[in-house]
């Protein structure tokens, strides 16, 4: 056995009919963990329903009911392998929920794959000014996804035309406007359906000499989409940062006690550590840490862990609280925070006093837009107008926000997963935000359990 491969997360974005699901499905089919029998079953069912051409997209369908409707909605986490990586695909079909999932979702994508359909009319629709594609790409960029791969799909429908591949020039301008550097992007012509340039070089596009991208890490070259995924720069996982673990749930387990559960976002959690929960302001000792019912030496970023804490009742802490190391930049309640907010789809105008619900990590809390400080250019961040009266769809602004209940958030620059949020209103995501700074407070006097203030470990004077 060689060394374990690194994990990378990719998000697949693009216009609704660009072929996202088919392309993603094809990769999972060929490199993923789906067995032959399931695939054959899919093919048979698809043929019976007269949807033979959907068979790859079907790999992404878990729910029978969705199959009959002929569209994919389910956000599915799917995995496949490249020579270098284990890849998790965060499929992104349904637009509204996709946005929320991308922000509060379990994982920050390391790279976005933008799928553009080459068909005449399709391409133009995909990158038009108000297209979903622009929204998705902007969102990925705003949320800190800095690596991008562009796949020009459906080349089979253009008779594999080299001339049509020239749309990469327009696509290149398009991604540049969003904020990406086209030099650092692999542009690959593919057919997600036929499989050309997906895993193997296409025989239909002899004119394509391969892609090249240039980043700080150097120049890389390749022919296929798989090569491009393999050339993603490995993400640095934030183990060296202080611990931040947003709680998903808190359980009471007979004979063991209180067990909070959540995903380690930064740092590590170990037995014996003294931790603080914010904004509850509870401090105690971690007795043990486990994952998938096995004891763990240490929980690392990305691990979903359960841990047992001493003398804390399930009433003291709850979902949305954040656990951190008491001795190392412990988390605190946010009295207010300043965020860069992009309004995506709000039917009216947003002014001071607007109070929607924010979804940030596992917290779900109403926050007031206290003061609109500046309207800014969403690409450069430059100020366009000071103290605007209101903002509307398409605008970006700096806003001072005040939570209606105790809440723990962090600046995006310090702890990314705790520094991005979705603004929900009218059952949809109306805006997204990235936190610039936080005014912290110690909140109410907290509970410190006896376990947290042990003077000396017993072993040291039991000699």
Curated annotation (Swiss-Prot):
What the entry lists under InterPro entries is as follows: EFTu-like_2, G_TR_CS, GTP-eEF1A_C, P-loop_NTPase, T_Tr_GTP-bd_dom, TRAFAC_GTPase_members, Transl_B-barrel_sf, Transl_elong_EF1A/Init_IF2_C
Tell me where on the tree of life, at the top rank, the source sits. Answer: Eukaryota
Q: Which Gene3D superfamilies match?
A: P-loop containing nucleotide triphosphate hydrolases (3.40.50.300), Translation factors (2.40.30.10)
Annotated source species: Puccinia graminis (Black stem rust fungus)
Q: Which GO terms describe its cellular component?
A: cytoplasm
GO terms of molecular function: GTP binding; GTPase activity; translation elongation factor activity
Protein name as catalogued = Elongation factor 1-alpha
Q: What is its main location?
A: cytoplasm
Residues recorded as bearing N6-methyllysine in the entry: 3, 30, 315, 389
In this protein, which residues make up the domain named tr-type G? 5-239
Location of the region described as G2 in the Swiss-Prot/TrEMBL record: 70-74
Q: Which residues bind GTP?
A: 14-21, 91-95, 153-156
N6,N6,N6-trimethyllysine-modified residues are 79
